[in-house]
Amino acid sequence: MVESKIIKLLEQVQSADPNSRIQAELGLRDLEKYHDFAAKLTDIASSGASVPLRQGSLIYLQRYIVHHWSPLFEQFQDGPIPDENVKKHVRETLLHLLVSLDNFTLIKAVAYAVSLIANVDYPDEWPEVVPAVLHLLQSTNENSINASLDVLDELVDESLVEEQFFIIAPQLASILYQFIFSAPPNDSMRMLQARGIKLFRSCLELIEIYKETKAEHVRVFLEQILPPWMDMFSHKFEVSLVDDRQVILPDSCGYFCIMGEIAMTLTKLRELFPSKLTPYVVTFVELVWNIIEKLLDPYIREVVFSDGLDDSAFGDKYPIRYLVELLLFVSVALQSKFVQNLFVSNTVPVPPLPPCIPLLVQYTQLPKHQIEVYESDVSEYIANEFSMDFASDTVRGAAISVLSAFEEHTTLPIQQSLREMSATYILNNEINWIYQEALLYACCSVDAASDDTYDDYLDPIYEAIKVRIDYSDAPILLLSRFFLFIGYFSESTVVASQFFQIIMNNLVNALQVDTVQYAAMKAIERFCSVGKVKPILSLQPMILEVLSQYASKSSDEALVLLVEAISSAVKLDCAKAAELGNSVIPLLFNLVATNASDPYICGIIEDTFEDIIHAANNYESMCEITLPELLQVLNQEDPIMVNIGATLLSCLIRAGPSPLPNGFVGYVLPPVYKITQIHSGDTELLQLSQEILKGLLEKDTPQLLETEISGSSGFQYILFILHQLLDKESDDSACFLVGPILLELADHASQMVDLQSILLSCIKRLAIAEQPRFIQSIIYVFAKLIVKDSLGMMHFLTSSLLNEQGLTAFEVLMTVWCDNFVYFSNFKNISIICIAMTKIYSFDSPLLDSVQVKGELISHSNRIITRSQSKLHPEEYSYVSVGEKILRLLSEEFVSLSKDAIVEEVSDDGADDWDDGPISAETFGLSANDVNELSKDEFSGVDNSEDEDNTDLQFYLLEFFKEAMKSNLHNINEVVFRLPQEEQDALVQIKEK
């Protein structure tokens, strides 16, 4: 009955009527409550029903698995988990389908369902799945092999832990090797072999994770498998792809894909285990370079000069991305000293230019289809060609990467040669303009990638360009490249300035095509920002006037370029631009208003606006121009526009004098208050409001606190805003500057009682806060106040009740303080926080013994667990008194400060035969966000000039422990022996001195 209902609903799901589909989907979800729903779906999939119906059953089975099979799935929903009998039936049926099906679509769906279940059930509940899948890999059926690779890809990428991996890996590597080593009967099977190489690469990536914890296992595994794999890779590279006429052989796409996957694997091996690649790298580079040479003619013929519309493949459907990978491998391999010697003769003082350089320039030529795109879409041209940060995911970019590697790692005169070739070939009518453009592009890109400044051999190129421009015979993209070249090297030679008027003429020429005009605009932007000889200041108004005419016609990348150019022109002389305020400021406001949702454009305009204000000779005059417009924007309903207005107001304050003009605060504070009321759910606007308040405090605290607005003081306005921020149910980031603002207020509040209410709001917020940075900022406020007046603050905290049950502010504060101590950073902050903790410990209150906080972790495992597993098995802690916890934290900090710095020697995997590659934050396990967080100055703008900020914390703690143990403060001498051994020893040593 249930099965027939499921079949009917699956049929309706495929109905053309959307209402029928929705009702059927709801019906299927309702049936998920039946314990055997998954079994029924697999039965339908294995039946003789139509393929669409069976496919639909497998799709719903996949959905059911992630929602109901196991709590380990992130998308798991409450509901009945199928019992073991149902699970066993589903697993067995799916494995049978994996072996018996011959329909590609169904096999893909089955393989995905198998991989999902295997992710959570292997090996404990489903040990037979991997042997079965490995057996499939040894079959001759392409669908079966595809299915096997699908499952293995998922297992290796998602679920294998180290114990399982080192059991499976040797067998997997052996079977994969045999599969890839064999000579397949057709090209489609070779495509599957390429997939197998990708799987092998995933195994290498997984091994790298374990090379610290399982170093010996990793060493043995690599030493056993790599030699035969490397030998096999060499043989695969030796296969010929083209015939004697340089025509790509039919049915060779699979071979090419294999070569591309091998290149990617070798690049990954260089990244993970460079010493393992060293013995083979020269052989591989010779083989790969031979392939690159042989593919040049087909690439030029079928991509660069072809009318074909497919820009992702060439030849016999060769994926271009694999040609990119072959080039990138050579680029990486050039870090090897042995590879460098392949191309450079050490016996010749100045080595001759090898033929590889002109070859690589040919690979940088623009394909015909790309030229057509660029000539019709200026934004696409700007996005891809105006930045010299070449995209290495294209053949053009990958070839530049190899040229740059030659420049960086060899003594070959790459830049000199490229420039000499350019000067010669630009005037040679027999050289195709596409090659001329490629040479100039290579000159700029290789220079941009180089860390060294090289300004020679440019003048002859400029002379050649001048001749071509005078003849007016350059095609559109070549003329554009002329201007880009001139602009790029304007910081290297004064000769570039001779072209300024020519470029301006093209910019104002209404008949000139967009591509050339925006290339001219980019050149002007470079002249203004980095030019060795910048345009004379008298030209600034004219440049800005010309650029302003493009405001209405620019969009997308062209608009970004326009804003960058305007910004650069303004910064020629910000003070002079300020004098043009009646024209420049409205232009900036118009651009920001029409592009309010573009953060990059808004950011540039905000910076430019701030620079103008900062340089203005008359700040009050600038306020008269800008404030009315800003307040008009702030009163709009659109939060995006309000955001822009608030940001610009913050810029205006930041660039202003100290103190601010009279009446300034009274003019801007009401709109800021209004923002916090009307847009109370907009985190970003609330943050901007706090930035404005903080800016006003930094610039003119007296005016802010004394200003009377509708019967309330500025001080009361701020307190009310802070109360609103702390009391509302929002993300902690909405209050991110409350702490720094409070510190400023604390320094100016006439009596402590003025802040008691807001401090209690802070403590209530701490009880539910989650973000460590916000928590630290508030704890820091209390730490500063305790250090300033420990007795008064402790009486306030211990006597203030937060609820009818008698919960004190002290209890909540110390619970959060102790639980989050591990997150506190920045030496000055930790110093103040630790000093405050010593004063709390010294306070005579029974709460130090009665208040309980988290102690040590009780239940934990050394095994890495997922977030889902941690939800199922939450960590448990012991509990200790807050007094003992303070002592424990302070002793840990003291021991940490006392230790000598240990510099760990990082292993380079014996890679001495390789030049160092670029080091990124990711090398140290840091994301870009981590780096940004670490680079922030904690609570910048807050006055940290007190003596406590400069305290030698190690010495301070030493004296504290010495005096505390002498007087046995809070039974410290007894508590010491409950501390970890290292802390115990340190404190006992202090006592004995």
From Swiss-Prot:
GO terms for biological process: protein import into nucleus. The keyword Magnesium does not apply. One of its GO terms (molecular function) is GTP binding. The gene is kap114. The lineage of its organism: Eukaryota, Fungi, Dikarya, Ascomycota, Taphrinomycotina. SUPFAM superfamilies: ARM repeat. Required for nuclear protein import and mediates docking of import substrate to distinct nucleoporins. Serves a receptor for nuclear localization signals. Mediates the nuclear import of TATA-binding protein (TBP) and of histones H2A and H2B. PROSITE patterns: IMPORTIN_B_NT (PS50166). Keywords: Nucleus, Protein transport, Transport. SMART domains: IBN_N. Pfam families: HEAT_IPO9_c, IBN_N. This is Importin subunit beta-5. InterPro entries: ARM-like, ARM-type_fold, HEAT_IPO9_central, Importin-beta_N. GO terms for cellular component: cytosol; nuclear envelope; nucleus.
